[in-house]
Amino acid sequence: MMSDCVKLNSREMAEFAADGLLRFDGIIPNEINRQFLADAGSIDTSNGEKGSNRTVKSLGNLMGHSKLPEVTPGTVLNTAYKETTALGELVRLPVVRGAIESLVGPESLVDHHFLHLALPTSYYKAAGIPQRSQHTHQDSTIDPRRAFDIQLFYFPHEVGLDMGGTRYVPGTHLRIVSESAIARYQNIRGQQHVVCPAGTLILMHHGVWHGGGINRTGDARYMFKIRLNPSIPQVRLWDTSDLSARDFEQRPIFFRKEATNPDDIASLLTRPQPWFEGDTGRLEYINRIRFWRYLLGDENFDADYWVTRIENEPSATV
């Protein structure tokens, strides 16, 4: 254990199971944000070499001179970042640490980290190359595991509407694709673009569809991403003290005499996204329920009978 932590509650975990992310606006203190930006360093946006290779060389030069550390894949998070550094302080904040432990456990492993930059318009003009948004993608490769990684998206400075904040599509994390097979989809119903105060942190399931936007300002936009792997089964790692027997009970469906409680676990798991279709959207309810079963360690859980119905295989008794 690195520090005290404030773990997620069951409603927050159900929201993560449904949306694939939890967002904490302005949660990182300004002194950490300032130190991180100083450690990251600045990129040279002056005139110089033209062509797309200029971007690669500029980013390589920044990484070479940055004070941000290299981390070997598989390093335990507890030891990856020194306590006296901005990143070390960030991952030890009680709320951040609690969220991490709730999702991937107390001894999670650093898969990798990377500094993502959205360069200003002037940079592309000087290089003589067009400015494009990043394609929509699902990170890494086809990943059929029930276990999941999380990615911390850290925005150390304010991100305005014109800065090309990361766009993401909530609820896509359980729809597995081959990384860039969705690249042609640039605008999807329900997608969100990050506009946020300094110190915003978004914790995403590794499967959420996302991509970087175009920065139309005169300043570089910074976003630092850390991918974390679990090292233990991700079963009931959060604060489960608010779970009650009611959270495991079936409720009337379709014909109801009373409105359902939107804060019920079943309601959170069956809350549609704008991109859901009337029929195939129901497959996402099934995916979410099965995901929640994994998190609970309870293969009998169901919400509104969606999974029980399709698993019903009566067998003859002798």
Please give the residue ranges for each predicted region.
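Conserved metal-binding segment of the jelly-roll/cupin
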Residues: 196-210
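Non-heme Fe(II)-dependent double-stranded beta-helix
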Residues: 1-19, 25-137, 142-143
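Catalytic core of non-heme Fe(II) oxygenases with the double-stranded beta-helix
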Residues: 127-194, 235-241
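Non-heme Fe(II)/2-oxoglutarate
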Residues: 208-209, 213-318
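Short edge-strand/loop segments of extracellular domains
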Residues: 119-121, 169-175, 227-232
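A structural signal for short, well-ordered beta-strand segments
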Residues: 113-115, 152-154, 224-228
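A conserved mid-domain beta-alpha-beta active-site/ligand-binding segment of alpha/beta enzyme cores
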Residues: 187, 192-198, 254, 258-259, ...
